[in-house]
Amino acid sequence: GFSQRLGFFPEVGPKTPGKRRFWVQAVSVGEIEAIGPLLRQLKAAGTAEIVLTTTTSTGYRLALDRYADVADRIGIFPADLWPCSALAWRRIRPDVVILVEGELWPEHLAQARARGVPAYLINGRISDKSFARHQRFRKLSHYVLGHFQQIAAGSEEDARRFRALGFDSTVTGNIKFDVASDAPMPAEERGRLRTELGFGADPRTVVLLGSSTWKGEET
């Protein structure tokens, strides 16, 4: 893992004729979970090679578990420093780069622009603190965000903030809501779980779940 952080990404090999190579960076577990539908759609199209990277060890393990049959290569994202990033870029040679949510890696994006590779931000988010910081350092913000060909915002509020900073943004919705379970939980297991949580096994009991109560995520 450490060698990959330095840019020594495993050689991906020659590109397949007729396919574009997508480098998708999802920082950790939440983002890795969320990008499943996107990766599977790219794979199903039959015209994409997928290189998936993540920043954390837990994200890496989850990526291997979930997407070994989807991604052509899974690895660790390089440190966002010129020598490390440039080395990884020479090894991966992507045609498209995709970042998820609030990830802004200036050197990674600079490498994309220098090579004429389009960069996209999906599920784009700007928190209250980040928005204030972007407004305060507007010149730096424009330099970084200006590398994206397109910004797909996770909510109307996020899109409004991107626009306030001078960047066009479309609202695609939060891709985390697109993640569906592969199969329903068996009734017996469902009843056991309800009992363990103190709700009782009666399926008629109404249970309200607040799964994500961070400001801006309540629905």
Which residue ranges define each predicted feature?
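A periodicity- and composition-biased signal for non-globular, repetitive helical segments
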Residues: E11, E31, R194-E196, G200
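Long, charged amphipathic helices and adjacent flexible linkers at domain junctions
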Residues: F2, K176, A180-F199, V207-G210
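Active-site and donor-binding regions of nucleotide-sugar-utilizing enzymes
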Residues: G1-P184, T213-G216
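Charged active-site motifs of nucleotide-sugar-dependent glycosyltransferases
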Residues: P17-W23, G200-L208, E217-T219
